[in-house]
């Protein structure tokens, strides 16, 4: 029997506000343990939360970017549970009336087709702290993350394969990043994914028993975990067994999902309205103000790169996959850089350098200005493409002007015949055996002189000019 896969995803995204959702403490990632905390984060008696307006701004932008309806009458709810990283013993979240609902996003699949994935809801909430279990028998609580603003985006169960889930996450990450509300860095926990997956016989409308997958710390692991679950559940069902409602984690080392716990039923969090935060209304004017702050999104930007700049669909997709790269490209082209040349450098040498160094574009010294200048001095013959690779590495590590560096480092290409011809004659004098081979008509003997000349000029001879002059001088040599 063949089965249809049904997948829904829950994605937590940390919003990039300066302070937390209900306290003025910094929401910055990477500080020392418990450095970003105050009495509200520790839930001292008598403290009251104060809503950060910037969080609601970000929530509105997310809802608009994901084609969602917006609940204009806003309130928060208490989600009650006890855990050491949650000192209040409840989380302030949204239950029955999330900020956004009934949305969708269009995703592009590997075969080039597109599919619209529904989004059930997006709600605002506070993050919990972090527990660390030490080898000394103690557990430690870091509340830096406690109160960091989150938006949880819950998809409809519209995905029918791990490939579609991967495509959905890719598209969602792009939209959130372009909207400017999160850096969506999974390695820093600012984007976290839980997956729900079930199988059912083709033609059956009722969903099968679902499994929840956790510990999915990359899009690749989401895909691998789901692929494993499809196989695991199908084998159980084909053998006559039943799927239990479980929470499982993906074990990257074993490339398998591991049981965490069996779910007996839905958790009862005893939601009720948060009494310490008043109701408020999101006005049409507020919504429109946030709409005006939204940028051009990846789909529209890709289309413009193809139609206006003449890039291929592939190049446009690669450039727009990351907003930082796309914005860099935009600025370089605005400065007069040739779109195709800038694209080639960003996807070629720049990407290779970043991968080798383990860095991002923001972490190196290359700027749109010095990249455009470097491309210009390649075009005008000041440097060769080969020398440009060395110049690029210097710019990436040290910054500064491309032309200034080339001149100071003595890398300017030699194009003057008055300089090159004497060097060619010296090459002939230094390589008598090669000259003899050439004069005797030995096949491909002339090719050796190209290498000799480039070595003599330390690679600085303009290849086009040098080859033309070399051919001219070789012809004279043959006549003598």
From Swiss-Prot:
Domain of life: Bacteria
InterPro entries in the cross-refs: Asn/Gln-tRNA_amidoTrfase_suB/E, Asn/Gln-tRNA_Trfase_suB/E_cat, Asn/Gln_amidotransferase, Asn/Gln_tRNA_amidoTrase-B-like, GatB, GatB_C_1, GatB_Yqey_C_2, Gln-tRNA_amidoTrfase_suB_CS
EC number: 6.3.5.-
Nucleotide-binding recorded as keyword: yes
Keywords: ATP-binding, Ligase, Nucleotide-binding, Protein biosynthesis
GO terms, molecular function: asparaginyl-tRNA synthase (glutamine-hydrolyzing) activity; ATP binding; glutaminyl-tRNA synthase (glutamine-hydrolyzing) activity
Reaction catalysed by this enzyme: L-glutamyl-tRNA(Gln) + L-glutamine + ATP + H2O = L-glutaminyl-tRNA(Gln) + L-glutamate + ADP + phosphate + H(+); L-aspartyl-tRNA(Asn) + L-glutamine + ATP + H2O = L-asparaginyl-tRNA(Asn) + L-glutamate + ADP + phosphate + 2 H(+)
The protein's role, per its UniProt record: Allows the formation of correctly charged Asn-tRNA(Asn) or Gln-tRNA(Gln) through the transamidation of misacylated Asp-tRNA(Asn) or Glu-tRNA(Gln) in organisms which lack either or both of asparaginyl-tRNA or glutaminyl-tRNA synthetases. The reaction takes place in the presence of glutamine and ATP through an activated phospho-Asp-tRNA(Asn) or phospho-Glu-tRNA(Gln).
Alphabetized HAMAP family for the sequence: GatB (MF_00121)
Assembly notes: Heterotrimer of A, B and C subunits.
The protein's name: Aspartyl/glutamyl-tRNA(Asn/Gln) amidotransferase subunit B
Natural source organism: Streptococcus pneumoniae serotype 2 (strain D39 / NCTC 7466)
């Amino acid at each position: 029997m063949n089965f249809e896969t049904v997948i829904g995803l829950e994605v937590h995204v940390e919003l990039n506000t300066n302070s937390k959702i209900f306290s003025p403490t910094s929401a910055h990632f990477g500080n020392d343990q418990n450095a970003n905390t105050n009495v509200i984060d520790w839930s001292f008696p008598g403290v009251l939360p104060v809503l950060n307006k910037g969080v609601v701004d970000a929530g509105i932008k997310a809802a608009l970017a994901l084609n969602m309806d917006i609940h204009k009458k806003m309130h928060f709810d208490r989600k009650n549970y006890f855990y050491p990283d949650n000192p209040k013993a409840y989380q302030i979240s949204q239950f029955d009336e999330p900020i956004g609902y009934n949305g969708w996003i269009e995703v592009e699949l590997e075969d080039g087709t597109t599919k619209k994935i529904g989004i059930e809801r997006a709600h605002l909430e506070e993050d919990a702290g972090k527990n660390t279990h030490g080898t000394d028998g103690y557990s430690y609580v870091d509340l830096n993350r406690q109160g960091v603003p989150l938006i949880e985006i819950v998809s409809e169960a519209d995905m029918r394969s791990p490939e579609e889930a991967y495509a959905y996450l890719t598209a969602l990450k792009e939209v959130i990043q372009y909207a400017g509300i999160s850096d969506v860095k999974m390695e820093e926990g600012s984007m976290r994914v839980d997956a729900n997956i079930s199988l059912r016989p083709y033609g059956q409308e009722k969903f099968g028993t679902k499994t929840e997958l956790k510990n999915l710390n990359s899009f690749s692991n989401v895909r691998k975990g789901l692929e494993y679950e499809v196989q695991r559940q199908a084998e159980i069902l084909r053998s006559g067994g039943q799927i239990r409602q479980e929470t499982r984690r993906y074990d990257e080392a074993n490339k398998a999902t591991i049981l965490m716990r069996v779910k007996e039923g839905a958790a009862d969090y005893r939601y009720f309205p948060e009494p310490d935060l008043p109701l408020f209304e999101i006005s049409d004017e507020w919504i429109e103000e946030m709409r005006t702050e939204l940028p051009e999104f990846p789909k529209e930007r890709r289309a413009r790169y193809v139609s206006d700049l003449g890039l291929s669909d592939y190049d446009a997709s690669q450039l727009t996959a990351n907003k930082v790269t796309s914005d860099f490209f935009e600025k370089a082209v605005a400065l007069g850089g040739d779109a195709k040349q800038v694209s080639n450098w960003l996807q070629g040498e720049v990407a290779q350098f970043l991968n080798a160094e383990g860095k991002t574009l923001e972490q190196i010294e290359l700027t749109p200005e010095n990249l455009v200048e470097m491309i210009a001095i390649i075009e005008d013959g000041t440097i060769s493409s080969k020398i440009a690779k060395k110049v690029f590495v210097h710019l990436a590590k040290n910054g500064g002007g491309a032309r200034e560096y080339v001149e100071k480092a003595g890398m300017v290409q030699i194009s003057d015949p008055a300089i090159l011809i004497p060097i060619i004659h010296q090459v002939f004098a230094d390589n008598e055996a090669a000259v003899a081979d050439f004069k005797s008509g030995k096949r491909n003997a002339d090719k050796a002189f190209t290498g000799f000349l480039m070595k003599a000029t330390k690679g600085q001879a303009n290849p086009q000019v040098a080859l033309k002059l070399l051919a001219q001088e070789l012809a004279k040599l043959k006549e003598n």
